[in-house]
């Protein structure tokens, strides 16, 4: 680990963490180690006395005073800086906010000797000695451009202040044009049940006939006040309001992405799952697969049909084809071999075509792939 207190002469005053490894360029590090404060931009050291200064002081005073002396100098410098900044601050406050006047006062304000110096101190470039002129110029708020064009654009810039008023006017006009107000595009959602102290009073307000108290005396709670999970299951009374469901246990320890050539989410497989599986995540709306069927592909056989029925009954989300089946009867224009193969008479209208079921090892997903040889009502659809 290394020591917690690093003593590098110019780096910081006081305890610090070991220097950051990544973001410090080697040159800067070298400067740090040499203790030369002028080059350091990212840390802001107390300025370190250069050897020349130390020598001068040593010439004047007995040696034990040097450090004390230097400290005093530092404090004086800091006080001066502070005073200059304060002065600048007060000057700044007095500038009127109205741009016309401000423009007049700007230039002489910035030519003031104090201001330049104070700006140099507060400059963003670490704590260096004079930063470049360019930096100074960009930092002091500079001269405002003058002339017709810039006037125009400055006005444009302030247009947003008018926006509110204009919007009101516009809405009002639109109201005049149409006789009656339009129905809202999104009607307000139905009011949710209010829980807690005022539930009863609100109930009474809504339907004067039924107080909730009667129901509560019988020990029942009106169904409007029952909370449900997303699926519709009732949340037992007394569950705290915001309790969240425990996070799903996930055997792979937070590894939810696919690394390059390991098929993590399908443990025990050497081959990637089908591109459809990867492309749109079937797992979210798939079928639970009976253990027996894992890893098999059924050409549509009795066994396949049976398993398919079983799977559908266990399906996680409603079968996507159910509403279709109700709506359109199976088409009768199949090629003959499909009808014969199914063993259904041509008129019975029960030709579903063939379906291949694909089960993935180690995952609860099954995909039924319609056989494209025989067009079906589902052909071309993976479900």
Curated annotation (Swiss-Prot):
Q: Where is this region: Disordered?
A: 1-21, 177-254
Family (UniProt): Belongs to the FAM157 family.
Query: What's the protein name?
Result: Putative protein FAM157A
| Originating organism | Homo sapiens (Human)
């Amino acid at each position: 680990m290394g020591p917690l207190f690093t003593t590098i002469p110019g780096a910081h005053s006081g305890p610090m963490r070991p220097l950051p490894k990544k973001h410090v360029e080697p040159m800067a590090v070298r400067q740090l180690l040499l203790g030369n404060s002028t080059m350091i931009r990212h840390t802001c050291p107390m300025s370190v006395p250069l050897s020349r200064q130390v020598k001068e002081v040593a010439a004047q005073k007995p040696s034990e005073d040097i450090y004390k002396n230097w400290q005093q100098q530092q404090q004086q410098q800091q006080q001066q800086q502070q005073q200059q900044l304060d002065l600048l601050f007060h000057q700044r406050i007095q500038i009127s906010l109205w741009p016309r006047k401000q423009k007049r006062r700007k230039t002489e304000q910035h030519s003031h000797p104090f201001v330049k110096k104070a700006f140099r101190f507060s400059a963003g470039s670490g704590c260096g000695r004079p930063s470049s002129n360019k930096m100074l110029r960009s930092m002091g708020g500079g001269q405002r451009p003058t002339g017709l064009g810039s006037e125009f654009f400055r006005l444009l810039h302030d247009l947003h202040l008018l926006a509110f008023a204009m919007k009101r006017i516009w809405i009002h006009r639109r109201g005049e044009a149409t006789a009656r107000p339009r129905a809202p595009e999104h009607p307000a959602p139905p009011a949710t049940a209010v829980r807690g102290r005022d539930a009863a009073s609100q109930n009474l307000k809504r339907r004067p006939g039924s107080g909730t108290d009667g129901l509560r005396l019988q020990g029942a709670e009106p169904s409007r006040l029952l909370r449900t999970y997303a699926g519709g299951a009732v949340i037992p009374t007394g569950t705290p309001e915001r309790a969240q469901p425990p996070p799903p246990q996930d055997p792979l320890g937070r590894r939810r992405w696919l690394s390059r050539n390991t098929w993590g989410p399908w443990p025990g497989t050497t081959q990637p799952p089908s591109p459809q599986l990867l492309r749109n995540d079937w797992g979210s709306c798939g079928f639970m697969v009976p253990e027996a069927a894992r890893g098999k592909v059924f050409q549509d056989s009795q066994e396949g049909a049976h398993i398919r029925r079983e799977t559908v009954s266990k399906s996680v989300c409603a079968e996507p084809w159910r509403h279709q089946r109700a709506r359109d009867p199976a088409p009768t224009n199949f090629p003959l071999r499909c009808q014969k193969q199914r063993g259904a008479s041509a008129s019975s209208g029960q030709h579903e075509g063939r379906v291949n079921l694909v089960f993935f090892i180690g995952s609860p997903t099954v995909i039924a792939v319609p056989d494209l040889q025989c067009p079906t009502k589902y052909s071309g659809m993976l479900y």
